[in-house]
């Protein structure tokens, strides 16, 4: 059974690349043609590359591996959060904090602070503090929560990254590469595919296209997890 159909890819507009003047020549092999100054991505290749990425994610997940979903551009934020939560994985959809991977211990301390504040709230510890102090703590919580809630349960480095637009998320990709963490990504015609281990050529600007491909990666995680359960 194919992971995705041509019809699904076409309907979501996965084939629309960027304007021809904004392109990376390394993406030439994934381009079918250009139409009215816009590159059209070869969906046969997208389907094939998505199959490869799907297999990788499924196998990783079956072995108990974890994936960090990354997409901070407006078109990706909702899909990244929804799909990561659906498959029980971690996500960053606001701003990538430099050092999230390469300085993981420090980031983890900030996460622990967030958990501590949440615990104080639950136990009613804030009610005994002066109002000014409470306001300050809640403001801190709001900021921490915004950037870190998606990685709150991530107690160690992830085994792979799934990225929407590696050009926009270049810091995340660079950190992953430095640590030899494989990167799966939706790569549009203006991106550098050499930075990515599992390239999925496609439109990274249309909400429907991003949602479709992100949901397939989440499906792969779920399928792998089911295999893991059966293997036990």
UniProtKB/Swiss-Prot annotation:
Q: Which Gene Ontology BP terms does the record give?
A: translation
Q: Organism's domain of life?
A: Bacteria
Q: Which GO terms describe its molecular function?
A: structural constituent of ribosome
Query: Cellular component GO terms, alphabetically?
Result: cytosolic small ribosomal subunit
Q: Which PROSITE patterns match?
A: RIBOSOMAL_S2_1 (PS00962)
Entry keywords, A to Z: Ribonucleoprotein, Ribosomal protein
Q: Which organism is it from?
A: Carboxydothermus hydrogenoformans (strain ATCC BAA-161 / DSM 6008 / Z-2901)
The protein, known as = Small ribosomal subunit protein uS2
Entry similarity comment: Belongs to the universal ribosomal protein uS2 family.
Q: Which InterPro entries match?
A: Ribosomal_uS2, Ribosomal_uS2_bac/mit/plastid, Ribosomal_uS2_CS, Ribosomal_uS2_flav_dom_sf
